[in-house]
From Swiss-Prot:
Subcellular location: Cell inner membrane; Cytoplasm
Pfam families to which the protein is assigned, alphabetical: P-loop_SecA (PF21090), SEC-C (PF02810), SecA_DEAD (PF07517), SecA_PP_bind (PF01043), SecA_SW (PF07516)
Gene Ontology CC terms, in alphabetical order: cell envelope Sec protein transport complex; cytoplasm; plasma membrane
Presence of keyword Signal: no
Biological role: Part of the Sec protein translocase complex. Interacts with the SecYEG preprotein conducting channel. Has a central role in coupling the hydrolysis of ATP to the transfer of proteins into and across the cell membrane, serving as an ATP-driven molecular motor driving the stepwise translocation of polypeptide chains across the membrane.
Chain spans, region Disordered: 1194-1220
UniProt-listed SUPFAM superfamilies: Helical scaffold and wing domains of SecA, P-loop containing nucleoside triphosphate hydrolases, Pre-protein crosslinking domain of SecA
Cross-referenced CDD domains: DEXDc_SecA (cd17928), SF2_C_secA (cd18803)
Protein name in the entry: Protein translocase subunit SecA 1
Named cofactor requirement(s): Zn(2+)
Length: 1238
């Protein structure tokens, strides 16, 4: 580091501390904004407390009924803010009765902060889990869903089971989602008022839902293919900094196997092992990057056995070798990952947990697997992806809580628009934070840590007034004298209390926080050699986490833990009897909710008494509480604060200290030179330590620098993901609209209109003909031609001009080819063979290289130009003559309409129409009419296909079944004799019946719209049907009409919760289900499968774009800007292709696969069949077999390729064989519906 840099750092430290003091002085005089906000919330807390006697006097049933009353008030127009104080008072009373815990005032304040959609910073041990019940209960009253989000499955389940008695006794439902749950289990959990789960599980469920073929609750489809999650309404995030900041860098990806060669990873690993650091590549730990030098590239090319990495077929090598080098030099075993069961499992750098199922992307995971010699997993192709940042930003309201948020307040606001409010503690903080100790080497540091653990754990320490410390065991103590047996001595010594400053008792519990598995195991070995019994908590002992943590506060406990971030378990002084009780009962009961209260209380009391935990807790408090040691500073200050926060909870005593060395990663990379020069000036030697506030501030500055860098990384990720986020939202919104019942007909007609408008704009452009001719002529002549030059030319003029331009261009092309292969100034590099090959390929000659060698260079150029001119002159451009005719664009448009939609038009119809919009309107009208014809034809196709049986060459028609179906579907009487027509005549006849039935749908749609409008009147858009209807009876009348006229199953209660838009969709869907069920099902399947397939392919394209866009930087372009521009171009191209593919299929329904047509058939009596099979067959019809894996993944953990048929049972009296058929046909039952009923 230069002198100027050191001086700048020192100035920054000095001025920074000065400004901090000035800010603190101003705050002490005027008060902080945070304090004023808390004071305002305290007023609400006082009012809640005043209500306590009122609710305390209620019976359990009366208290439970408050939930019903609150919901009634909300339906009548009150808001959550209006009922907040009363709801909090009810929740507080519920906590007292059903949990044995009363919410403190500061917890009420925390609940208000969370309800407002902000982040509450609460010190560890202040009861965040209980705080979450307040806003969760309040917001669950709306019945729109509340998600409580934690960092792992264990905490999600534990917190749900712990708080469930409160929710359930207040009349709410609650459950937790867990990884590995079946689809039906998750649907049940999401159906609850409050759902607990992990950030990843909520995120992945969002992505899975957007791959499913049916909306939540759509009973036309099997439950396993329906969506689970529902709208994202309100989320409460525990450890919000860990989830929204640390985890935000990791995108969530659902992927499937890609067809790639795995052997290349082993080859790249072999090459990487032979390259030498510094000579062949450099490692930048600060930027987490490895870069090959020029010498390294040449060495790697030689080792890989290729001529150049930058020629076709070899361009993947640099990326493979970069990944292999990163695997060896940046990703370390037992730090970044572990090897478990011959698999590489990632270790979360912030929590120390194993992340089973996670993979590094872009081939890095495979590179690490090759390094470790374990089986290499297949690389994957993305089916769905999103960052946690963008998923959580979609919640209508978001809140969170953590012990450490203020350091990241700026980022929370900039990214999520979330304020941070620091909540005061219930009791004063008694934690003593000792200054850092800094050592020269890591070896010295670990020895000092082991000494400190031994001192605290094994020995009583007498501290004298002169600063001397004597370690030993106190044998006796009186008011005046202490008898101590010093360490290693056989004789006791006596010390007068007058000479003693302090006595530190042995057995104080110690928690040591490390940054990696490797460091925790190294320290464990040191303690074992000293005979100190201890527990190690890291990713390898994940299963014993609860047992270990529950004992960490007991007398004499020594616990080594990798990062405590996200652990979520309080360390209670003396031990936690409830954790031990559950560890005994978890094998007997599936959840804590199943444990009888009496058995639970008896076991907890028995453990507490047996283990003497309550008494131990008092002793531990007397000897100083939990002592926390940090083995090094984390790059994030929050992680250090979380480690410190493990002690001193709820006003308990405690202490913490960090031990550092110059060899620590943070010190070495960011602060090493500065601190090392200071220690050298102070004359420090190995084994010695310094305590310096200046060094501590320098370390804090280094941490802040890293945090700023990480923020920039996250911000960059967000900027890249913004492109995909907008595209994802557009695709998912389109898809969701389809699932939610938006008219698939209207969506298809929009695609048709867009296509027609696009083609009209293209074909009727005045320059379309000359543009086409210039492209055609340029391709034939092998040169670039400017379309503008051909305006107002006839064919002869255009032919002459084009060839003249081509001859001029050929002269330049020949000269360039000669200069490239036979450079005039470097005759020794002439390549006659390449020159001959070029001439033969481009000019149609038949030269051998020796023939050209015998020619003079200039003579050869003239001869090649002559060949080029001759070739151009002989080129026939007559095919392009029609392109220059005035009505060429109109003729192409008419041909396109005929080919695309089967609609006949002539240029004469539009030749005199100057306004292109009128052409578009007329073509749209004709396309809609053609589509209406298809709409009438398709049900007939499904019916004939359904009742036609093909056995080899034999084709038979079930006439009786068809007659029965025609009667039910079109309400038309038809005899068996009438269907003894040939298939084409029968089809024509049935289409007429279909048209008659379909014509009634328009009137029914109008009638439905009128009824909805009458029900809602002038009500606001968000008002529900029940509130709009009131006591008028209109809602019940609408439900009756839907049931009697359309056979719809929705009850008045089902409709009551819908607003105007939702009810409109429901009634229009009911009309379509009555009159066009087959067509709507077909449209839906075609749209879903083409959208899903196109999106999946687009994601792969965007993956490739993102990996290559960095090269734009070499061309002085901003890669992010280019990524956004090119990404949007690709997306619009994808969207256009969706329209083309869908409309191509819809207007060619006659050529659909028979299996697909049958899958969209709907029984006129029940309208239920195997919808999942319909989805599969639609894929066949659209020729999108590649999407099957994605759909299967979306169907849930069962991975079923086909769904089971819903059985519809109707209990009716048994009908005799010879009795009249109840359908009214006049036939006997055995000759009519008995066949159909089986």
């Amino acid at each position: 580091m230069s002198i100027l840099e050191r001086l700048w750092d020192l100035l920054g430290l000095v001025f920074g501390s000065t400004f901090e003091r000035v800010g603190s002085l101003a705050t002490s005089v005027f008060g902080s904004a945070n304090a004023r906000q808390v004071a305002k919330l305290q007023e609400s807390a006082d009012r809640i407390t005043a209500m306590e006697p009122k609710f305390a006097a209620m019976s359990d049933e009366e208290l439970r009924d408050q939930t019903v009353l609150f919901r009634k008030r909300l339906r009548e127009g009150e808001t959550l803010d209006d009922i907040m104080e009363e709801a909090f008072a009810v929740c507080r009373e519920g906590g007292k009765r059903f949990l044995g815990m009363r919410h403190y005032d500061v917890q009420l304040i925390g609940g208000m902060v969370l309800h407002s959609g902000a982040i509450g910073e609460m010190v560890t041990g202040e009861g965040k889990t209980l705080v979450a019940t307040l806003p969760a209960y309040l917001n669950a009253l709306e019945a729109k869903g509340v998600h409580v989000i934690t960092v792992n499955d264990y905490l999600a389940r534990r917190d749900m089971e712990w708080m469930a008695p409160l929710y359930m006794n207040l009349g709410l439902t609650v459950d937790a989602i867990q990884s590995g749950m079946s689809t039906s289990e998750k649907q049940a959990a999401y159906q609850c008022d409050i759902t607990y789960g992990t950030n990843n599980e909520f995120g992945f469920d969002y992505l899975r839902d957007n791959m499913r073929p049916a909306a939540k609750g759509d009973d036309r489809f099997p439950s396993e293919v329906q969506q689970c999650q529902g709208p994202l309404n309100y989320a409460i995030i525990d450890e919000v900094d860990n989830i929204l900041i640390d985890e935000a860098r990791t995108p969530l990806i659902i992927s499937g196997p890609a067809d790639l060669d795995l052997g290349r990873y082993g080859e790249a690993d072999r090459v990487a092992r032979q390259l030498k650091k510094e000579e062949h590549f450099t490692v930048d730990e600060k930027q987490h990057n490895v870069t090959l030098t020029d010498e390294g590239v040449r060495a790697a090319e030689e080792l890989a056995g290729v001529e150049s990495f930058y020629t076709a077929g070899n361009m993947e090598w640099p990326h493979l070798i970069d990944n292999a080098l990163k695997a060896h030099y940046l990703y370390k075993l037992d730090v970044n990952y572990v090897v478990k069961d011959k698999q590489v499992v990632i270790v979360d750098e912030f929590t120390g947990r194993l992340m089973d199922g996670r993979q590094w992307s872009d081939g890095l995971h495979q590179a690490v697997e090759a390094k470790e010699g374990v089986p290499i997993k297949q690389e994957t192709q993305t089916f769905a992806t999103a960052s946690l940042q963008n998923i959580f930003k979609m919640y209508k309201k978001l809140s969170g809580m953590t012990g450490t948020a203020m350091t990241e307040a700026d980022e929370f606001w900039k990214i999520y628009k979330l304020d941070v409010v620091a909540i005061p503690t219930h009791r004063g903080l008694q934690r003593i934070e000792h200054p850092d100790l800094i050592y020269l080497t890591e070896k010295d540091k670990f020895k000092a840590i082991a000494d400190d653990v031994e001192r605290t754990h094994k020995w009583d320490v007498v501290v004298l007034k002169d600063g001397t410390e004597i370690w030993g065991n106190i044998k006796s103590e009186t008011d005046s004298v202490v008898e101590l047996l010093p360490k290693g001595e056989k004789q006791t010594e006596s010390f007068s209390h007058e000479k003693i400053v302090a006595i530190e008792r042995a057995g104080r519990p110690v928690l040591v926080g490390t940054v990696s598995i490797e460091k925790s195991e190294r320290l464990s070995a040191l303690l074992e050699r000293r005979g100190i019994k201890h527990d190690v908590l890291n990713a390898k002992q994940h299963g014993r986490e609860a047992d270990i943590v529950s004992q960490a506060g007991r007398i004499g406990a020594v616990t080594i833990a990798t990062n405590m971030a996200g652990r979520g378990t309080d360390i209670i002084l003396g031990g936690n009897p409830e954790t031990l009780a559950w560890s005994q009962l978890q094998h007997k009961y599936p959840t804590r909710l199943e444990v009888p209260d009496a058995e639970w209380k008896a076991l907890v009391d028995e453990i507490d008494e047996r283990e003497n935990m309550s008494a131990e807790g008092k002793i531990v408090r007397e000897i100083g509480g939990l002592y926390v040691l940090g083995t090094e500073r984390h790059e994030s200050r929050r992680i250090d604060l979380q480690l410190r926060g493990r002690c001193g909870r709820q006003g308990d005593p405690g202490g913490s200290r960090f031990f550092l060395s110059l060899e620590d990663d943070l010190m070495r990379i960011f602060a090493g030179d500065f601190v090392k020069s200071m220690m050298e000036r102070m004359g420090m030697k190995e084994g010695e330590a310094i305590e310096s506030s200046l060094v501590t501030r320098r370390i804090a500055a280094a941490q802040k620098k890293v945090e700023e860098r990480n923020f920039e990384i996250r911000k960059s990720l967000l900027e890249y993901d913004e492109v995909m986020d907008e595209q994802r939202k557009r695709v998912y919104r389109y898809r969701q609209n389809l699932l939610d019942g938006h008219s698939s007909r209207e969506m298809l007609l929009t695609l048709i209109h867009n296509e027609i408008q696009s083609q009209v704009e293209t074909f009727l452009d005045p320059n379309y003909g000359v543009d086409t001719f210039s492209t055609f002529a340029g391709g034939k002549l092998g040169c670039q031609l400017d379309a503008r030059d051909f305006q107002n030319m006839d064919f002869e003029m255009a032919d002459t001009y084009a060839k003249d331009q081509a001859e001029r261009a050929s002269e330049v092309t020949v000269a360039e080819a000669v200069e490239e292969n036979l450079p005039e100034s470097m005759e020794d590099e002439w390549n006659w063979k390449a020159m001959a090959t070029w001439a033969n390929t481009h000019l149609g000659t038949n030269y051998q290289d020796h023939q050209l060698k015998n020619k003079d260079r200039e003579e050869m150029i003239d001869e090649l130009i002559a060949h080029a001119h001759k070739q151009i002159e002989e080129t026939d451009l007559s095919e392009g003559e029609p392109l220059l005719e005035a009505d060429y664009g109109l003729r192409v448009l008419c041909a396109w309409m005929r080919h695309k939609f089967g609609i006949e038009t002539t240029p004469e119809e539009f030749r005199d129409v100057e306004d292109r919009r009128k052409v578009t309107e007329e073509l749209n009208r004709r396309a809609e009419a053609a589509y209406t014809e298809k709409e009438a034809e398709y049900p007939v196709l499904t019916g004939i296909s359904r009742f036609t049986d093909k056995q080899g060459a034999q084709v038979s028609l079930d006439r009786e079944g068809l007659v029965d179906w025609v009667h039910g579907r079109f309400n038309h009487e038809l005899s068996v004799d009438e269907v003894k027509l040939n298939r084409d005549d029968l089809k024509v006849q049935l289409i007429q019946y279909s048209k008659q039935t379909a014509s009634a749908s328009g009137g029914m749609h109008a009638q439905a719209a009128e009824k909805v409008e009458d029900l809602f009147g002038r009500a606001d858009a968000d008002v529900t049907a029940s509130l709009a209807s009131g006591q008028s009876g209109k809602l019940e009348a609408l439900a009756t009409w839907l049931q009697e006229e359309l056979g719809n199953r929705n009850t008045a209660e089902d409709l009551s919760r819908m607003n105007r838009a939702e009810l409109t969709l429901a009634v229009n869907g009911a009309v379509d289900d009555k009159f066009h069920p087959e067509m709507r099902r077909m449209e839906r399947q075609i749209l879903l499968n083409i959208v899903d397939d196109s999106w999946k392919n687009h994601l792969l394209t965007m993956d490739h774009l993102r990996s290559s866009v960095g090269l734009k930087g070499y061309a002085q372009m901003d890669p992010k800007v280019e990524y956004k521009r090119e990404g949007m171009r690709l997306f619009e191209s994808m969207w256009d292709s969706i329209g083309e593919r869908v409309t191509d299929l819809i207007f060619r329904m006659e050529s659909f696969n028979d299996d697909f047509i049958r899958s969209t058939w709907v029984d006129a009596r029940t309208r239920h069949d195997d919808a999942h099979e319909a989805g599969r067959s639609a894929q066949q019809a659209a020729q999108m077999e590649s999407n099957t894996a994605a759909q299967r993944a979306a169907a849930g953990s069962e991975g079923r390729a086909e769904g089971s048929v819903d059985t519809v049972r109707v209990e009716e009296p048994r009908i005799g064989r010879n009795a009249p058929c109840p359908c009214g046909s006049g036939k006997k039952y055995k000759s009519c519906c008995m066949r159909r009923d089986g």
